[in-house]
Amino acid sequence: MKEILAEMITRAAFKAHEQGVLPSDAIPQPGLEEPKQEAHGDFSTNIAMVMAKVQKMAPRKIAEAIVDNLEDPENFLVKTEIAGPGFINFYLRPSLWQRVVKGILDKGDEYGRSQIGAGQKVQVEFVSANPTGPLHVGHGRGAAVGDALAALLDMCGFEVEREYYINDSGRQIRTLGLSTWLRYCELKGKEIDFPKDCYQGDYIKDLAKRIQDENLADLDSMEEEDAVLWCARFAANDILDGIKQDLKDFRVVHDVWFSEQSLYDDNSVQNALEHFEKTGDIYEKDGAKWFKTEDRGDEKDRVVVRNNGLTTYFASDIAYHKNKFDRGFDRVIDVWGADHHGYVARMKAAVDAVGRDKDAFEVVLVKLVNLLRDGEPLAMTTRGGTFETLADVVNEVGADAARFIFLSRHYESPLDFDLELAKKQTNENPVWYVQYVHARICSIEAKAKDFPVSLDFDWDRDEEILKEIEEIRLMKALARYPEVVEGAARTLEPHRIVFYLRELASAFHSFYHDHMVLKEDQTPVLTKARLDLVTTVRQVIRNGLALLGVSAPESM
C-alpha cells in the first residue's frame, strides 16, 4: 500500500507543479509512516514540510496543493486530511487490507523475500572463537546474531556466505599445547608449577588424560618442544571438533572454515607484508615493522612485525581480509565481541590500504551476556552446577529459547539471560509467547476440517468482510512484515524481527480474545475469511522464526 500511496503523492505533486502551484519540479520520494494514533489515519506523510524550503512556500499550502491534485481512480482512499504544520493523513478503505491476506496465502514461505541485494555477494564471518576452549555464552550470542544476519541478507536477495576464521596459529596455540603437555606430565607423576598464563580449565586436564588413556602419542620419547607442538595440534583439533558440534546443536552451519595457519603456509602473510613495504604503507622503527594506519583514520600506527621477527595478529588479519575481497565479496561483515571495538579502525585502515572502500567492511560488535537464575546473577565457573559454556545453556533451555533470547535486544546492549524464565511455559517467556500463537493456530486449522466453511471463497472479490478493528489491526501488522525484514537487513539489526513477532503475537491475542474463528452462528464466508486470516498469521510467524533459526511447533 505504501508504494501505491507514494506514487499517488508524487503524481499529485508533479501535477501541481505543471499547474504552476508548486514553483519547483524538485519532488522528493515521499516518506510514509503509520501514525501512532489510529485517529490520524492509516498512513501519514511529511513531504510538504520536506519540500517547503525548495518550494519557498508554507508547508500547509504545499499539502493543500498535493491533496487537491490527488487522483484516486480505484477509490483506495476514504478521505485525506491535512494536520498540524502540514502533515497529510490518509484513511484507506478497510477492504484494501484484505489484499494482504491473499498475498501471504499466495507467497507462503516466500512472503517477505525481496531483491534489494540482488547481484551483491556478501560474506558474514562470525563466532571465530580461538580453538583453545569451549564456546561460552558470549560466543552463543554472536553465533545467533551472525546466523540471523546471514539469513536476513539471503532473504533480501544477497548472495551470502557464512565463514568461521580458525585462529590456529600464534602464541595462543603454543600456550594451549604447553598447557596440555604440562597436565600430561602431571599425570605421569611429575611435580609441575603450572604457569598462570597457561589455560587453567578442567578441559585441559581432560585432554591430557585422553592422550594418556588412549595412548595417542609417545610423548615421553619426544623432545619437549616437539611434544608441545603435538599437544597443540591435538588439543586445537579436538576443541575445534567440539566447537563444530556445539554450533551444530545450536543450528549454526558455516559454509567455510578458514584456517589462519593456511595464510602462513601459502605465504599470503609474507606476500601482503612485502606488498605494503613496496607501497610505503609499512616502515621500520625500533627494530619493528609498522603499518601506517594513523594516516587512514586509526589513532596511531600499528606493529605488524615485532622486533623479534615474529608477526602480530594484525599482520595475518591484513592478509585474511585482503583474501576475502580477492574472493570477490562486495561486502564483508565481521561479527566481533564488543571488547574488540578498538580493533575496528585499524582493520578499516587495512581495507582502505588494500584498495577497497572502507564502508565495504562492516563490523558488528556484540556485547556480553549476563546469565541469571530467577533474577540472580549466576557465577561463571567451568564446573559444579553453574554455567559458562554455550552447550550448558542449550542443554538446559534448548536452542529455540537460547537463540530467540540472544536476539531479543540490540547486540550493542548488554543482555540479561534468565535461565529459569527461558524455561517457563507462560507469556513471560518471549519465545514461548510467539511459538504458542503458531501452535494455537495449527490447532484451529485442525479443528476447521470438521467445520462448515465456504470453500469457494474468493479473496479477489472487492468485498469488505474483515472489518472489525482487531481484524484490521492484524492485517496491518501482517502488511508490515516485508518492510521489517528489509529494514533489519539494511541496518544489520536482527532484533527487529523479534520485536515484530512479539507485536504480531500481541495483535493475534487481541483479535482472538474478542473474535472466534470457528463459530456456529457466523456465516461460512466469515469463518473462511477469519480462518485464512489466522493462517496468514501462522505463516508470517513461521517465516520470521525461520530467519532467527527458531522452530515453529505445531503443538505445545
From Swiss-Prot:
Its main location: cytoplasm. It is an enzyme of class 6 (ligase). Signal peptide: none annotated. Keywords: Aminoacyl-tRNA synthetase, ATP-binding, Cytoplasm, Ligase, Nucleotide-binding, Protein biosynthesis. One of its GO terms (cellular component) is cytoplasm. Its EC number is 6.1.1.19. It holds the Pfam family Arg_tRNA_synt_N. HAMAP family: Arg_tRNA_synth (MF_00123). Belongs to the class-I aminoacyl-tRNA synthetase family. This is Arginine--tRNA ligase. It comes from Desulfatibacillum aliphaticivorans. The gene is argS.
